[in-house]
Amino acid sequence: WDPILDKFEEKNNCEVDLQIIPWDNYSEKFATAISAGEGPDVGYMYAEMYPQFIESGAVEDLTNYATKEDKEQSIYIKTSEMMGGMYGMPFQAANPGVLYYNKDILEKLGEKPPKTWEDFKRICKKATQDTDGDGKIDQWGLAQGWGAKTFGNLNWNWYPYLWQAGGDIFNDDLKSVKFNDKSGLEAANFLKELQAYVPEDSLSKDSNEMIESVFGPGKAAFTIMLSSAATSVFDESFPDLNWGFVTGLEDKKAATFGAVDHLSLMSSAKNKELAYKLIQHMLSVESMTEFHKAIPRAPITKGEPYQGDERFKEMVENDKNVYRPLVVGPHGVEIYEYLWKELQTMISGDKTPKQALDDAAKYSNDLLAQ
């Protein structure tokens, strides 16, 4: 960032203090800084962070700041609309959770990459085998971990299936949830059925651990993880893994989770006009082209060349209608945390899919009614 920010400092006769915060507990550290009056003028935020800051007035509505050119230049500008306002400018996107498959396993099974739930379940069943004849399953259909203590694995274990079934988390008015409706129950029942083809220790491992111990070593036909895992995990740790990917399965529609993170103007900024100018500068075609040359990612602005992983170029160009972020709604973090724990009880068998979803929905709706 230094050469990019140097240009801004010189042009605007100011100094920019860029602070990089480690990802672990990022949202908690961010919130603590704001409550202590030590927050940034411009903050990097992801969807789950926004509700509390919008409700407390800590983040500025950009409706009167963003120009027509700003909006036209941004590829993912629609994601800026949150809870009745415009609270950020898209900064990081096009790194969705894709369905990876083991090409060698599918070839041995005589199967092509799946398109539908029916395809997926059939292949998972065929792939789940005792390959060495010792009486124990040693190859699985799906490497899926349910042991994470926090809700982040909803990105791979829940949202894609919910959206593919035609469901969503919130009703349109954001005053109640809908994930326990017919579509949500279809998704939950499907996930429960898939557990016959998932390693038995799924409740003791998270998704990353399942990839490291099962999919990466070639012991599963499928897993779901960020497209960037191709470089950060497979290329680094499993260079011999023969993999391919499907952007998202289809039931009622094709869908998968793809976060869009934003740069936001914080209400505590003393010079809001200058702070917004910084956002504009950082997100300009020139700046993003320079940044993505050093840190390869898909374009965030129109006119920017593609400098990301070539293996995902076609996906980025053609599947923008398949991957999507969360709808930002009130009490998001509390709702997601509770839902995750209820889904874990479903996987463990302590509750039926309907019981788990209904209990999570009751908690959520009681919270939203306060």
Residue ranges and their predicted role:
Residues 123-126, 173-204:
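Glycine-centered hinge/linker elements that transmit conformational signals in sensory
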Residues 7-75, 81, 86, 104-115, ...:
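Extracytoplasmic "Venus flytrap"/periplasmic binding protein-like
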Residues 45-97, 112, 121, 137-140, ...:
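Hinge/lid segment of periplasmic solute-binding proteins
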Residues 87-91, 97, 121-176, 220:
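Extracytoplasmic/periplasmic solute-binding protein
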Residues 3-4, 14, 183-190, 261, ...:
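Short amphipathic alpha-helical coupling segments at ligand-binding clamshell hinges
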Residues 51-52, 223, 227-240, 251-341, ...:
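C-terminal lobe and pocket-closing loops
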